[in-house]
Regions:
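Sparse, context-dependent recognition of short Cys/His-centered cofactor- or disulfide-binding micro-motifs
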Residues: 6, 56, 133
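A contiguous loop/helix-start segment that scaffolds small-molecule binding in enzyme catalytic cores
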Residues: 80-158
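A short, terminal or domain-edge coil/loop segment
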Residues: 8, 15-16, 20-32, 64-77, ...
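Class I S-adenosyl-L-methionine
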Residues: 1-41, 120-128, 138-157
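Class I SAM-dependent methyltransferase SAM-binding "motif I" and its flanking Rossmann-like core
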Residues: 17-85, 139-142
């Protein structure tokens, strides 16, 4: 920034992610400021989070009345399993939902873009398809940004 911008110029980072939930870009900028080699103001512009886009596109609520929703990473889901009946998972390179057959999944990739992909259904029925779509999309584009909501299927519906 110091080498690219003049004293009266403005720079910006357009970052794909959810700065209110998870975004290391803000932490990096804070670290640069902390070092004191350059001074600048940081403004995070609010937008639509991937979680809001996911639930809107699937036409489901994020929460259920009187029930908690847990937001976690794929790594934590793999380590601890689901800790609530509703779990939002981000950053899951390993499809940690596999085997959670008592959950319905609402999965989305590239949410809000022309390349958006949506799949929903019981994990036991759509899990393999999600893995295939995810692998194909990642190979085609070179990257993937996906998010999903797991919702426990009531025992009476099994």
């Amino acid at each position: 920034m110091r080498d690219e911008l003049g004293p009266d110029e403005t720079g910006a980072f357009l970052v794909w992610g959810d700065p209110a939930v998870y975004d290391s870009t803000l932490a990096i900028l804070d670290e640069i400021l902390r070092r004191g080699n350059v001074a600048f103001d940081v403004e995070a512009v609010p937008g639509i989070s991937s979680v809001a886009a996911l639930t809107a596109r699937h036409r489901v609520g994020l929460t259920q009345v009187g029930r908690p929703t847990h937001l976690t990473t794929g790594r934590r889901l793999a380590e601890r399993g689901p800790t609530a009946d509703d779990v939002v998972v981000m950053l899951d390179a390993h499809c940690s939902f596999a085997g959670l057959d008592d959950f319905h999944i609402y999965w989305g990739a590239y949410l809000g873009t022309p390349d958006e992909i949506l799949v929903s259904g019981p994990v036991a029925e759509v899990g393999d398809r999600i893995r295939e779509l995810r692998d194909e999309a990642r190979a085609r584009k070179g990257w993937i940004m996906d998010t999903y909501l797991l919702r426990r299927i009531p025992a009476a519906d099994h």
